[in-house]
Amino acid sequence: MEWELNLLLYLALFFFLLFLLFLLLFVVIKQLKNSVANTAGALQPGRLSVHREPWGFSREQAV
């Protein structure tokens, strides 16, 4: 009786972790697709993309 309960718990834990793994994989793939789409959109020749440095000054001012 006890080993059946252990088997049930291990199976439940296994499927729960498998579900979390697939969920994480789905989120990562979705983020990668968004990142690739944003990069492709920013590199189109018709669009002007303003590149701002995170520390507040541009490369031209640094020289």
From Swiss-Prot:
Q: Which UniProt keywords apply?
A: Cell membrane, Membrane, Transmembrane, Transmembrane helix
Q: Name one GO molecular function term.
A: transmembrane transporter binding
Top-rank lineage group of the source organism: Eukaryota
Q: How does it sit in the membrane?
A: Single-pass membrane protein
Gene Ontology CC terms = plasma membrane
Q: Where are the transmembrane segments?
A: 9-29
Cellular localisation: Cell membrane
Just give the chief location class: membrane
In residue numbers, the region (Important for interaction with SLC2A1 and SLC2A3) covers: 7-29, 51-57
Record note on quaternary structure? Interacts with glucose transporters SLC2A1/GLUT1 and SLC2A3/GLUT3; the interactions may promote SLC2A1- and SLC2A3-mediated glucose transport to meet the energy needs of mesendoderm differentiation.
Role played = Required for mesendoderm differentiation. Interacts with glucose transporters and promotes glucose uptake. Probably augments the glucose uptake capacity of glucose transporter proteins to meet the energy needs of mesendoderm differentiation.
What name goes with this protein? Small integral membrane protein 43
Q: Which gene encodes it?
A: SMIM43
